[in-house]
Amino acid sequence: MRLIFAGTPEFARVALAQLHAGGHEIALVLTQPDRPAGRGMKLQASAVKQFALDHGLALAQPRSLRLDGKYPEDAAAAREALVAAQADAMVVAAYGLILPQWVLDVPARGCFNIHASLLPRWRGAAPIHRAIEAGDAQTGVTIMQMDAGLDTGAMLQAQAIPIGAGDTTGSLHDRLAELGAQLMLQVLAQAVHGSLQPVAQAAQGVTYAPKIEKHEAAIDWTQPAAVIAQRIRAFNPFPGATAVLNGETLKIWLADVAPGVPPVSKEFGSILAVAPVGIEVVAMKSIVNITQLQRPGGKRLGVAEFLRGFDLQPGMVFERHGS
């Protein structure tokens, strides 16, 4: 099938690579403009752009696709490229730009989207983060026929996978990226044979997954340990949960729930115990056990290695959220 592909991060690159390897003709790739990244804040190409360059694929990086928006010249050039591609369908995966109706109307068979949740749960920008943050037992991938709404299109394929107790957004992302690519290959095969069976999304069970904001990463020790541990895993690898101790902001990468209940005399955020296997911290009627953390400018370290260069003692107190 002759395709336009629109995507930006690694999640999308996995799908593009499998579509390319699967024999589909990639007539055009859309990805977001290069962004400053890293310590030097140098412009970096997206994972999708790098794949397109490596494989000689036609590429466009419009700042917007809205003909009446801030960059109408970008949108007009993109429309010319999309129409010229004469694609059978467009595959969209974590592109990051709003697709106006004119874009949806260009491909002969419309636009198919890879969404990393079991719709209608977790419509929006951050479905993987929000599923872990909420403590969901499972998530999955939905392939949908795109319409003008926010992840409201008819479902063409869906498959669930469990969320493990130790899953982070990073680990779950990798499994969902592979699953999404496989499901999209199935959907395209069905499209070729005219056997697609669209199913409308349920009106019940709709939840939204708004974009992750950095301020959300500050740990609130007044919450239960299970909630804190879920948020730590949800914000790994981005933006990284944070906690402030003696004026220094630490990144907390991994944690679980320790057995027992803290003494009522201990304030939230108090360090109860320090051992090579974990740092126990007081939460709401429960105890968080931190197992991996990082100092500013340092590396992620397990507790045993971290303690070699940082003196942590029982009785120290992490600052309260918002204090």
Swiss-Prot record:
Catalytic reactions on record: L-methionyl-tRNA(fMet) + (6R)-10-formyltetrahydrofolate = N-formyl-L-methionyl-tRNA(fMet) + (6S)-5,6,7,8-tetrahydrofolate + H(+)
**Which principal EC class is assigned to this enzyme?**
transferase
Locate the residues binding (6S)-5,6,7,8-tetrahydrofolate. Answer: 117-120
EC assignment: 2.1.2.9
Q: Which PROSITE patterns match?
A: GART
GO terms for MF: methionyl-tRNA formyltransferase activity
* GO CC annotations on file: cytosol
Q: Does the keyword Isomerase apply?
A: no
Q: Supply the Pfam families for this chain.
A: Formyl_trans_C, Formyl_trans_N
Coiled-coil regions listed in the entry: none
Does the keyword section mention S-adenosyl-L-methionine?
no
Keyword tags: Protein biosynthesis, Transferase
Give the UniProt family note: Belongs to the Fmt family.
NCBIfam families on file = fmt
Protein purpose: Attaches a formyl group to the free amino group of methionyl-tRNA(fMet). The formyl group appears to play a dual role in the initiator identity of N-formylmethionyl-tRNA by promoting its recognition by IF2 and preventing the misappropriation of this tRNA by the elongation apparatus.
What name goes with this protein?
A: Methionyl-tRNA formyltransferase
**What is the originating organism of this protein?**
Albidiferax ferrireducens (strain ATCC BAA-621 / DSM 15236 / T118)
